[in-house]
């Protein structure tokens, strides 16, 4: 086949897409809109932000988390000491949130190990699974079935009921 062919005999097939005609009588309105947005919105916002960042760079303020001292447990409060009971309640709520975070962290570690190990996760993640089961059991022993209106008093009553049930089970086991 020769390098050049006779274009009169074998014309080129027509293109499927029409050739763009860059010559139009009207300018593109999108160009004007983007320039107007840049001038009216983007540049002033950028200038204000850069100014604020420079001011913040001059005056650095360091944020630290708040540390609460431990307060007495609700069992150590006097009967009419409302302030002590309130502090004990707030301490219990902080402990509750900390325990929730501990369970979440251990669960994330277990999930990461299972993801990393794939099919052999039962064998290779046994330590993480054992730790997770211990943490979840301790969490459920303390906080399970408290309901939506949980409090330190309800938790203490639940703990008392659990201790009484354990004593009763121990007596029955000793008698049998």
UniProtKB/Swiss-Prot annotation:
**Residues annotated as region Disordered?**
1-27
Q: How does it sit in the membrane?
A: Peripheral membrane protein
Name the keywords, alphabetized: Electron transport, Membrane, Mitochondrion, Mitochondrion inner membrane, Phosphoprotein, Respiratory chain, Transport
Localization of this protein: Mitochondrion inner membrane
Q: Where is the composition biased (Basic and acidic residues)?
A: 1-15
Which residues, renumbered to this chain, carry the PTM Phosphoserine?
151
The answer to whether keyword Mitochondrion applies is yes
Pfam families with a match to the protein in the record: NDUFB10
Quote the cellular component terms of the Gene Ontology held in the record: mitochondrial inner membrane; mitochondrion; respiratory chain complex I
Q: What is this protein's function per UniProt?
A: Accessory subunit that is involved in the functional assembly of the mitochondrial respiratory chain complex I. Complex I has an NADH dehydrogenase activity with ubiquinone as an immediate electron acceptor and mediates the transfer of electrons from NADH to the respiratory chain.
Identify its protein family.
Belongs to the complex I NDUFB10 subunit family.
Q: How does it assemble?
A: Complex I is composed of 45 different subunits. Interacts with CHCHD4.
- Please state what the protein is called: NADH dehydrogenase [ubiquinone] 1 beta subcomplex subunit 10
């Amino acid at each position: 086949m020769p390098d050049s062919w006779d274009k009169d005999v074998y014309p080129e097939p027509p293109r499927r897409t029409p050739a763009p005609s860059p010559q139009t009588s009207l300018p593109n309105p999108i160009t004007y809109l983007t320039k107007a947005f840049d001038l009216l919105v983007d540049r002033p916002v950028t200038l204000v932000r850069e100014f604020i960042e420079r001011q913040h760079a001059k005056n650095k303020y360091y944020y630290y988390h708040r540390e609460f001292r431990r307060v007495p447990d609700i069992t150590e409060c006097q009967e009419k000491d409302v302030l002590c009971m309130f502090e004990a309640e707030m301490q219990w709520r902080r402990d509750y949130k900390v325990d929730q975070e501990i369970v979440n962290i251990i669960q994330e570690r277990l999930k990461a190990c299972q993801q990393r190990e794939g099919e052999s996760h039962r064998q290779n993640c046994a330590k993480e699974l054992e730790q997770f089961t211990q943490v979840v059991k301790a969490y459920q022993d303390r906080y399970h079935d408290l309901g939506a209106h949980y409090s330190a008093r309800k938790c203490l009553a639940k703990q008392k009921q659990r201790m009484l049930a354990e004593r009763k089970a121990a007596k029955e086991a000793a008698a049998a």
